[in-house]
Swiss-Prot record:
Ranges of residues in domain Protein kinase: 40-291
GO cellular component: cytoplasm
Keyword hit for Nucleotide-binding: yes
Keywords assigned by UniProt, alphabetized: ATP-binding, Cytoplasm, Kinase, Nucleotide-binding, Phosphoprotein, Serine/threonine-protein kinase, Transferase
UniProt xrefs under Gene3D superfamilies: Phosphorylase Kinase, domain 1 (3.30.200.20), Transferase(Phosphotransferase) domain 1 (1.10.510.10)
GO MF entries: ATP binding; protein serine kinase activity; protein serine/threonine kinase activity
One BP term from GO: negative regulation of apoptotic process
Similarity annotation: Belongs to the protein kinase superfamily. CAMK Ser/Thr protein kinase family. PIM subfamily.
Main localisation: cytoplasm
Name of the protein described by the UniProt record: Serine/threonine-protein kinase pim-3
Subcellular compartments: Cytoplasm
Amino acids binding ATP: L46, G47, S48, G49, G50, F51, G52, T53, V54, K69
Length: 323
């Protein structure tokens, strides 16, 4: 009997009978983000530059090491949007590249403040930037350089796939994990969305910039990146950058101050071709014969000492961290 009564009411609740009823759409519930000061603790300065200051920090909940970059609004020249909010383009680029790939720094969070933005990123421990790493060694042997260089190429390829060009590839923007030898590309403050047309602005490091920028203040993203990769590879195997002055960049003459294999020299010279159209593509660099030479390194000659998980961490507690 009860079931039959429910059945008799079905016409009242049917969709057709409800067409004339007003429908009230509730606005989505906005979840407020916890204040930065409650989520993170900030410590000492890791570094500073034209785009802001980077601090060491940690996440309060679990002690996760983080790097916090404070970017002043007045210094931001390139902007983008996330969820309809205007943010520095650097945050947009980090969001694009920072997931699913270990070779670039990962964005964890960001906050807007009245005077600027706080960009929260992962902070790898037991790392050293490649500049300091090379300085300590004097220069890298070709096997170590090859392994590092391939990782940089993979990071660049990943960025391209995400529609991003870094525009400031250099030794100071690469972190070396001292336990594994893994490299991580950092600092997208000079980056841009990748495009096939010319760029007429450049905020990267001048000694890594291509001759077409020095002479014409114009360049294409991919060919300019290849030039900076040539400078970086020279830096790895020779211990210093090839050019210091604008005139040297425009002349493009190379002097190899150390004994370098002909294959490595040829790849560097190719990347540092004065005409952008003469430079290799990223895939041509991957396919170059020097990139495929034997990578067997004797343990006594290895620059990176691999550590197993059960290694006594206390023996390596001091680290030179850089972001």
């Amino acid at each position: 009997m009860l079931l039959s009564k429910f059945g008799s009411l079905a016409h009242i609740c049917s969709p057709a009978s409800m067409d004339h009823l007003p429908v009230k759409i509730l606005p989505p519930v906005k979840v407020e983000k916890e204040p930065f000061d409650k989520v993170y603790q900030v410590g000492s300065v890791l570094g500073s530059g034209g785009f802001g200051t980077v601090y060491a920090g940690s996440r309060t909940a679990d002690g996760l090491p983080v790097a916090v970059k404070h970017v002043v609004k007045e210094r931001v020249t390139e902007w983008g949007t996330i969820g309809g909010v205007m943010v520095p383009l650097e945050i947009v680029l980090l969001k694009k590249v920072g997931s699913g790939f270990r070779g670039v720094i990962k964005l964890l969070d960001w906050y807007e403040r009245p005077d600027g933005f706080l960009i929260v990123m992962e902070r790898p421990e037991l790392v050293k930037d490649l500049f300091d790493f090379i300085t300590e060694k004097g220069a890298l042997d070709e096997d170590t350089a090859r392994g590092f260089f391939r990782q940089v190429l993979e990071a660049v390829r990943h960025c391209y796939g995400c529609g991003v060009v870094h525009r400031d590839i250099k030794d100071e923007n690469l972190l070396v994990d001292l336990r594994t030898g893994e490299l991580k590309l950092i600092d997208f403050g000079s980056g841009a969305l990748l495009k096939d047309t010319v760029y007429t602005d450049f905020d990267g490091t001048r000694v890594y910039s291509p001759p077409e920028w020095i002479r014409y203040h114009r360049y294409h993203g991919r060919s300019a990146t290849v030039w900076s990769l040539g400078v970086l590879l020279y830096d790895m195997v020779c211990g210093d950058i090839p050019f210091e002055q604008d005139e040297e960049i425009l002349r493009g003459r190379l002097y190899f101050r150390r004994r370098i294999s002909p294959e490595c020299q040829q790849l560097i010279k190719w990347c540092l071709s004065l005409r952008p159209s003469d430079r290799p593509t990223l895939e041509q660099i991957f396919d170059h014969q020097w990139m495929h030479k034997s990578e067997v390194v004797k343990s006594e000659d290895c620059d990176i000492r691999l550590r197993t998980l059960d290694t006594d961490v206390s023996s390596t507690s001091s680290s030179n961290e850089s972001l």
